[in-house]
Structure formats: C-alpha cells, structure tokens
Amino acid sequence: MKKQIFAAVGAVALTLSLTACGAAEDDKLTISLVPSTEGEDLAEALGPLTEYLSEQLGVEVEGVVASDYAATVEALGAGQSDVIITDAGSLYNAMEQHNAELILRDVRFGATSYSSVAYTNNPDKYCDDEPVMATYAAADTEMAYCNGIEPGDTATGEGPAAVEKLGEITSDTSVVLQSSTSPAGYQYPVVAMEEEGVNVDDVNQIPVEGNNNAVLALANGDGEVAFGFWDARSSVIEENPDITTDVVAFAYTEQIPNGGVAVRSDMDPELKDKLAEAMDNYAESSDEAADVMYDLVGLSDWTAETQEEEINRYGEILEYFSK
C-alpha cells in the first residue's frame, strides 16, 4: 500500500475492514469520511452517528477516518469502504472512476451550494446602481450589495448574478485571488472572468491565503477586486467593522456545490434507500444528532435532492484546471 489511507481511531467499532466489500456483505457497512473533529474526541464524535445508523438499518456500521478527501475515493475503489462522506470534487471522481452513486448532498446554512462573490472597493466602476444593504442572516449583519444581486431585505447569495460586470476588469486591475485549488477564491472566478473576455494572465494578480485575507486586501487598498465565498466579509467584522460597507459585493458566479454522500455501485438497492433515508433524517432525530453532525462534518443536514448536474459541472471545472 503506497500510503496510509486511514488513521486509527480506537474503540467504538471504528476499525478498518480490509476485506473487499460486495453485495453479499451488506450485513456490515463501512463509512469513510474526513471529520472536522480531531484528536481524542474523534471516537466520541463518530459513535452517535454509527450507532444511529446501525439501529436504523439493522446492520453493523463502522466509521473510518480518511487522511484527506482523495483517500475516501481510494477507499471506495479499493473495496475498503461502502459509503463515503466527502467533498464535491471527490464525489465527482468517485462517480467517474468507480461508478459510485450519489445519494445525498450536504446542507450548510440551508443550501446545497454557494456562489463565489466578486467584491470591490470601487463601486463607481463596478456598480450600475447605488449599493444597498441586505442582511446576511448567518451573521445577522447588514452588508452592501449592488447590481441588483440582492433585491430583498435578506441576502440569499444565489448566483449567477451580474457576472457581466466582471468584464469591467482590465489588464491594469489588481485582482485578489486565492490558491489555485480554491473553488470560490480562484477556480470559479477565473472561469467567470474568462467567459466575460478577461485575460486573467494579464491582470495584476494579488495572491492571498484565505477568504478573510481576500476581503481584507480590499479594505486595506491592496487590490480593486477580490473573490471569496458568500459572505467572506462576515469573517472579519470584529477586526474591521467598516468592511460591511467599504467592500461591496457586485456579482455572483454560478453555484459551487457542497459535498455529499456516495455509495458503492453494487450496494443492495433496498439497503441503499434505507441508508439514504436514515442519513437524511439524522439531523432532525434529536438535538444531540444536530450537534454531532455540525461538530463531525460541519453540516446542518443532508438532503436527497442531489442535483447531480452541479457535481458534474464542478468536475468539468476541475478538469479544466488539471490541463
């Protein structure tokens, strides 16, 4: 084995089964995931989920910890896992490489996807109207938006919207971009700019790490346009309260999918349906379950509305940047 796929997590039936999974072994399920929780609390965090699923399905359910998202795909392909909870790119790879079936999508803040936001400190150039204030509910704070991307009192963050305004970016524009592996900070923005006729290689790229630093760069005058998740300004309000008005959101890219849950292709259909239903209902099953789900994988829910086309589109963008 070229690398260690899983980290051991001790008790609570969290050992890795090295035997190949198959349709005849549906009396036991192994779930691979990359949890938010680290260290000694890991077994405690996984236990309630695996115990709940065992009770709902009537089969033994084990949880194993993958070293990273790519390792969840390796585990599924190697027959070391039946179910993976992973990010959108790994879902796409599992579907393409191992014919995995997508059964659930991750829900964060009530949504299965999010847009990359184009921010600016120069609304005179990028806004066709006066910026308006709309409430970003997750932070219970009003933020500035323009170009009609938020017509209501409460922001929704739904894209695409006003992407044509990216065409105002010229070769002398300082554009703040994050790592080339960042969907919201680089990949989707670059595709959107290129579709609007912007030669990204010609702009003055300002590299930063993290969505917080992307919007802070605008607040500090280090760039004119920046990209980040919706709404990155909320992450720096305490250190820079004026960022809610000084940095304006002026466009949304197409939606970027959250991750989800996929299963091996030969899983018994009845068990697969029961698994999807049980996981879909988990967050609502108890207050403890909701807390465990947030602490374990940073989610508020799962949903059976898989919107597979968003995952496939994400795969296209990944392939574009792998050339």
Tell me the role of every PLM-derived stretch.
Residues 107-185:
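A conserved helix-loop-strand patch within extracytoplasmic ligand-binding domains
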Residues 35, 115-127, 256-270:
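A bilobed periplasmic-binding-protein/Venus flytrap-type ligand-binding module shared by bacterial periplasmic
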Residues 29-48, 263, 267-323:
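An extracytoplasmic/periplasmic, membrane-proximal ligand-sensing/linker region
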Residues 16-20:
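C-terminal motif of bacterial Sec signal peptides marking the signal peptidase cleavage site
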Residues 63-74, 201-216, 255:
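Short helix-initiation/N-cap motifs at beta->coil->alpha
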Residues 100-111, 201-204, 237-255:
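Short beta-strand->loop
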Residues 22-24:
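Bacterial signal peptide processing site
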Residues 85-99, 191-195, 219-220, 224-245:
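A ligand-binding cleft/hinge motif common to bilobed small-molecule-binding domains
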